[in-house]
């Protein structure tokens, strides 16, 4: 399992032999093409001369298979179910903005949703950055996610949202597919989806595994609900009396050591309880990578943890411990 670039790097270094690799599965193949990964996929396929089968998994139907895949006879298997566009357990709303710039209306909508988890979808990277900065300036706990970020920045953003340190995820359509984040309450279309497939993938982030969810179209003065939306759309009235932005219960810290430094989840819990003086109930999700780790801790104890662990070693190793903002 790995990205095309990472797998090619392993092959170049001789970490495993291509001789015995008979099958290649590329997940989200259409999305890889859309994001410009043709060169990486082409190099990987060229590095695997003994392939007998290529499996290209896609949520959309390809007009043609790119030549670099070197496919022979192509057989298409369609597993899509003939079912309704959006499950009935998702309620669809429209919210009218009096201005073309909808940021103020977005802020009011998010205030009305309280501490519920929401993904705000936009169509452009710079729009994600602008919207995220605006919401943060208003006191919201957000994560920004798009393809222009470095890998570690995307990991930071995704981890904060998945562990509850940020309850608002501001993203391009990159966040509409391939992210395994359960229990998302709301989908907000700040920008209208560019096509029906985009709409379906966005809305599919909520109401998973029989849960319920809500999706909101944020409409400017000249915008209307797209014609491909076949569900009933209700008007959503934002209350006049709104609370302050909800602060998530957890915050995320970064620890600059990981698996290859012989650091385990148990080591981290012990360290934070002993040195950081936390109770185990004040520690949330822990994700240990090769060279670093993310940990969710109670937001009310964040300053305490950072102060008490400053300059302290974990398992006799010096490290950096800081908040992921």
Outline where the language-model segments fall.
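Conserved interdomain hinge at the start of the Helicase C-terminal
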Residues: 88-136
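A short beta-strand element within the Helicase C-terminal
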Residues: 168, 177-192, 214-218
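Walker B catalytic acidic pair
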Residues: 4, 20, 27-29, 183, ...
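Post-DEXD/H (motif II) to motif III coupling segment of the RecA-like Helicase ATP-binding lobe
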Residues: 9-10, 15-84, 223, 228-231
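Conserved helicase ATPase core of P-loop NTP-dependent helicases/translocases
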Residues: 128-134, 140-172
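Conserved two-lobed SF2 helicase motor
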Residues: 1-11, 158-177
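Non-catalytic terminal extensions of ATP-dependent helicases
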Residues: 238-325
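Conserved segment of the helicase C-terminal RecA-like domain
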Residues: 168, 195-237
């Amino acid at each position: 399992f790995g990205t095309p670039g990472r797998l090619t790097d392993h092959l170049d270094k001789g970490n495993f032999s291509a001789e015995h690799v008979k099958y290649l599965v590329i997940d989200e193949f259409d999305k890889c093409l859309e994001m410009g990964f043709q060169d990486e996929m082409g190099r990987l396929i060229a590095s695997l001369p003994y392939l007998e089968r290529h499996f290209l998994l896609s949520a959309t139907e390809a007009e043609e298979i790119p030549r670099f895949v070197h496919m022979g006879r192509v057989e298409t298997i369609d597993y899509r179910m003939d079912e309704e566009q959006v499950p009935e357990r998702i309620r669809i709303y429209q919210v009218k903005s009096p201005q073309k710039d909808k940021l103020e209306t977005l802020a009011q909508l998010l205030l009305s949703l309280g501490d519920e988890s929401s993904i705000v979808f936009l169509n452009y990277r710079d729009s994600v950055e602008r919207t995220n900065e605006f919401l943060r300036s208003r006191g919201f706990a957000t994560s920004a996610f798009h393809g222009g970020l470095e890998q570690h920045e995307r990991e930071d953003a995704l981890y904060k949202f998945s562990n509850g340190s940020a309850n608002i995820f501001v993203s391009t359509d990159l966040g509409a597919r391939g992210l395994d984040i359960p229990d998302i309450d709301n989908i907000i279309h700040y920008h209208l989806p560019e096509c029906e497939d985009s709409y379906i993938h966005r809305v599919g982030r909520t109401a998973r595994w029989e849960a319920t969810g809500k999706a909101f179209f944020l409409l400017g003065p000249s915008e209307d609900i797209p014609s491909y939306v076949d569900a009933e759309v209700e008007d959503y009235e934002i209350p006049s009396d709104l609370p302050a932005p909800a602060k998530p219960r957890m915050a995320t810290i970064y620890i600059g050591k990981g698996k290859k430094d012989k650091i385990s989840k148990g080591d981290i819990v012990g360290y934070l309880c002993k040195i950081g003086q936390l109770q185990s109930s004040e520690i949330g999700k822990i994700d240990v990578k090769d060279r670093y780790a993310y940990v969710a801790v109670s937001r009310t104890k964040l300053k305490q943890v950072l102060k008490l662990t400053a300059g302290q070693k974990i398992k006799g190793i010096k490290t950096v411990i800081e908040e992921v903002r």
